[in-house]
Regions:
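Residue-level preference for alpha-helix termini and adjacent loops
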Residues: 61-63, 160-163, 211
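Signature for HUH/AEP ssDNA processing cores
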Residues: 1-105, 111-132, 232, 296
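Proline-rich low-complexity regions
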Residues: 52, 143, 165, 285-288
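Catalytic "initiation/cleavage/transfer" segments centered on a nucleophilic residue
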Residues: 137-196
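Modules that initiate DNA replication and primer synthesis
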Residues: 72-76, 84-91, 105-127, 168-172, ...
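A short catalytic or substrate-binding loop motif that flags glycine-/basic-rich loops and adjacent residues
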Residues: 47, 59, 158, 217-218
Length: 305
């Protein structure tokens, strides 16, 4: 087995009780109650068929999750997904995510973890990212289920699957932080360097309240809470940059400087809103990733991913 194949299999490992496979005759996916074996994955990478994997495992854990963002049905003909803008947002907040193109031309935004964690915790963190990126959690977020039950016949449920990238080895490709399309080998190396431990990502919980209140001002204020906590000496300038970048595509538009001053900044100057979390601010204020005190991603069994 070549290294990129082994990395792909590990990075997209999920439920072993079944998977989805596309039937070109019906133009639909069928759920197969069988293990997605190495041969099945190889057939996907060779282009023989297209498969989808269920992130949640039989023990209700998951080692990865994905936000499926595909607004094409709400856009005019000829619409092209703004991948460059999405990547700028991810880069700005240093979010631990990688982006691949979906089958329909939208974005699959993936979080990769060093081992399986409770699915509810993985899903909850992905909702935080969806909230700050898109202002809503009303999107398809995988794992969709946080606990697998049993059907009416007493059989164990298998969960919902999501299409895998790189069908045929060269479609639904991954983009790096600069927006460059990556071949399979490059993508597996890139994603392997972005595998994280869930506990190290706790600071990102500040990006949204537990009830995820929608609206431009709510989203911007909560981003401000995060930025003030982790960049206390420069948070006001960062909030202004956040406003221009993240609210450019918001239905309410970018806040004017006057609006920003009289609402978000005024509130944040008066009070700290991060008492519910106990993570420490970064010791090196010049380093936006200094709060990551755990093992570096490159040290987490990179050869296996």
């Amino acid at each position: 087995m070549i290294k990129s194949e082994a990395q792909f299999i590990n990075l997209y490992s999920g439920n072993q009780q079944g998977y989805g496979v596309y039937d070109p005759k019906t133009n639909e996916y069928e759920f197969i109650h069988a293990t997605p074996t190495v041969e099945v994955i190889r057939d996907h990478l060779s282009g023989k068929h297209s498969i989808g994997v269920v992130p949640i495992r039989a023990d209700n854990t998951s080692s990865w999750g994905t936000i499926d963002h595909d607004p094409h049905h709400k856009k005019p003909d000829g619409y092209k997904y703004p991948f460059a803008d999405l990547q700028k947002k991810i880069n700005f907040l240093d979010l631990p995510l990688v982006v691949t193109k979906s089958k329909r031309g939208g974005a699959h935004i993936k979080l990769s973890l060093d081992k399986p964690y409770p699915a509810d915790k993985v899903q909850h963190l992905l909702k935080k990212f969806a909230y700050t990126l898109f202002g809503t959690v009303n999107l398809e977020i995988f794992p969709k289920q946080i606990k697998l039950g049993y059907d009416d016949e007493g059989k164990r449920e298998c969960g919902s699957y999501i299409n895998l990238p790189y069908k045929g080895g060269n479609t639904r490709v991954m983009l790096n932080s600069e927006g460059k399309e990556l071949n399979l080998e490059e993508a597996m190396k890139y994603e392997s360097s972005r595998v994280h431990r869930l506990d190290d990502l706790k600071p990102f919980k500040l990006l949204a309240k537990k009830d995820f209140p929608e609206g431009r001002n709510n989203k911007t204020h909560q981003a401000g809470v995060y930025l003030k906590k982790h960049f206390p000496e420069d948070y006001e300038n960062r909030i202004k940059e956040y406003n221009k970048l993240f609210n450019a595509d918001d239905p309410d538009g970018v806040l004017s400087i006057k609006e920003l001053e009289s609402t978000i900044l005024k509130s944040l100057r008066r009070k700290d809103y991060d008492q519910e979390l106990n993570e420490d601010a970064p010791k090196n204020k010049a380093d936006p990733t200094a709060w990551r005190m755990g093992t570096k991603a490159s040290e987490i069994r990179e050869t296996e991913y």
